Amino acid sequence: MNEQLQKESGGELAFKFYPNMVMGDEKDVIRKMRFGQIQAAGFTGFGLGEILPEIRILELPYLFRNDAEIDMVSEELYEYFSIALAKKGYVLLGWADVGWIYFLSNDPVAEPKNLHKTKVWMWQGDPLAEAFFKELDKSPVALPITDVLLSLQTGLINAVYCSPMAALVLQWFTHVEYISDVPFTHAMGAILMDKKAFEKIDASNQSILLEVCKSNLRSLVERSRIENQEAYVQLSMEGLEKVVSTVDQRLKLRLIGERVNERLAETLYSHDLLSKIDSLLVEYRKTDD
């Protein structure tokens, strides 16, 4: 992406990357963007929600059935969220993709009641996860993501949720025995740029930046999905046992998701936005079934 950006802008545009949380966690990065220390950054839904809470609607539990539904809704709402983020002082450069999120645990988790046997982690300060566990009447262990591995090692927690790739990269899989076969949500991400920094770029280069980022991020999403599929297989090869849910158990999970989605309407996002997404999915599924 950087090479293409430099080429098409005649060397006037380029990114300098700081990987692996060099600049701190997502809240730290947001703070540094506000002070002008960083001009652009990649965020998971957690960080995006700190900026624009309603964007977390794209990560509601059991909302999407497949990647195609995610792509359709994300594209339909791209302009909506671009405008909303601009009002907060950010430019949306493109969607990213963390992946489908599974439970990994030391006890099998096939349905909601199974979580009551676990000491399950919750990303500290995440209103979406908090609502999910509240609906289950389960008290999770709230921790920043940087404390999860040590907490697994010490036994403070024995269940986590993440994408297959994250389980491998963060080494969380080394302290659990099971992985669910049904993801409970999909985690999204995006690249944002400080609006003031963006507006300092001339109009022609703004167009180049937006086009290059969006197209390259689309390719990155496709690659990430393949890598997550491969990572799920790798986790099985590493000894994790897949927990297969029955049709009845899957239905229970979806009903939990629907209640959580309603619980968060008008606190995290509007009923109108939820209804719009529901309508988009209903129409899409008519043609897809």
Regions found by a protein language model. Name each.
Residues 81:
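Basic phosphate/pyrophosphate-binding loop/patch that engages nucleotide-derived ligands
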Residues 1-69, 77, 85-289:
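N-terminal secretory/targeting leader peptides
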